[in-house]
Amino acid sequence: MKTLKAAAARYNATSLILRIVIGLAVGAVLALAVPGAGWVEEFGSLFVGALKGIAPVLVFVIVASALAQGTSRLDRRFGTVIWLCMLTTFLAAAIAVVTSFLFPQTVVLAEAAESEVVPQGLGEVMNTLLTNFVANPVSALLNGNYIGILFWACLFGLAMKKYGADSTKLFLANTADAVSQIVRWIINLAPFGIMGLVYTNVSSNGLSIFTQYGRLLLLLVGTMLFMALVVSPFIIFVYLHCNPYPLVFRCLRESGLTAFFTRSSAANIPVNMDLCEKLGLDKDMYSVSIPLGATINMDGAAITITIMTLAAANTLGIQVSLPAAILLSVMSALGACGASGVAGGSLLLIPMACSLFGISNDIAMQMVGVGFIIGVVQDSVETALNSAGDVEFAATAEYHQWRREGKPLPAFLCK
């Protein structure tokens, strides 16, 4: 028993990134050495099954809790922060659509399958969307209807905000925390799941799958870097009328670098608050806007959801029209806010976006598995983009207010 506890302690003390890399390597080696060992595949099946089981509950309780706990005491600066977060999240999803159209990706799934229902156009997509919105909420949870889950979670959260007692809201918040902890436990076992998923793919398709996954990863990271180094600086320039890059690079260096390794916007909140203090921001403002940004500023998540969904559509041969892609951008932006700083949260929202195009939950969860395989890099870059943006937009809102009041901007911005 002591040996088992010691092994578990050593396992938990090892970086998750290192464990995933080891699991990936072990899965590939086992696939080449013993391709007929079916028991290894079961690790991947169990991992994906656990994710499939917890994901609907995760989306519902996190969205409902976030809305129920929402605050209405927001001045002009908070309004600016919310606007910037929502604007850039939508732009991130839209840019991801453009890059996916320019560089379309397909992936090798564990089970070759076709979409159960291939939508013929935007009208059919809209019909599916509206029908799924008002589906029975219990049925939506049981069947993984993420559009219905999101709709009912929003209504439940808004109603709870108005009519719920403080103790009830606390219970909802505690439930969200408990479900998030279950997700962390599952993701803590991701190395074993990744081992099984890689084993299945390599034993069936050879090592060439890593080339395809590499192209998909390159598209994801490239789109995120474009967002971080081009789009966000341009928006900051529009608000501050000065060189945005001193602020951008400082946020990437002091916030993004830490977030890259923690892989959690929520875990990076203390780092961001310390940086806000160094930037001379109002503590009453950033003490609320930074946690708010960790919830709704999800540029990287929107990019991940959009690109992975379109890759699934391309893999299944589904033709996605431009209007349907725009609809996907909106859905990805809204869904990304549900990622809420949960490790791997954006990947768990891929099925919601996939459901727009009639892609079955089984295929969508295979895409989630692919996401975990490349997540060592993807999730780190995504979190760095999101977390650095939290400080960038808090600073932009504050400094924009300074400009309106005739107060000089910090010296480092005027270089």
Task: Identify the function of each model-found stretch.
Residues A50, M86-F90, A94, V221-L225, ...:
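Hydrophobic transmembrane alpha-helical segments of multi-pass transport and channel proteins
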Residues E41, S45-G49, S139, L170-W185, ...:
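Short amphipathic alpha-helical coupling elements at transmembrane boundaries
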Residues A8-A33, V48-L51, R76-L247, K407-K415:
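Signature of multi-pass transmembrane helix bundles
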Residues L67-R76, K162-D166, N205, H241-P244, ...:
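Juxtamembrane helix-boundary/capping and inter-helix hinge elements in multi-pass membrane proteins
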Residues I307-K415:
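Transmembrane alpha-helical segments and their short flanking loops
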Residues D75-V81, Q181-N188, K278-A294, L322-P323, ...:
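Membrane-interface alpha-helices at helix entry/exit sites of multi-pass transporters
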Residues W39-F43, D75, F171, L207-R215, ...:
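Membrane-water interface of transmembrane alpha-helices in multipass transporters/channels
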Residues E254-A336, P408-C414:
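Helix-loop-helix junctions within the multi-pass membrane cores of secondary transporters/permeases
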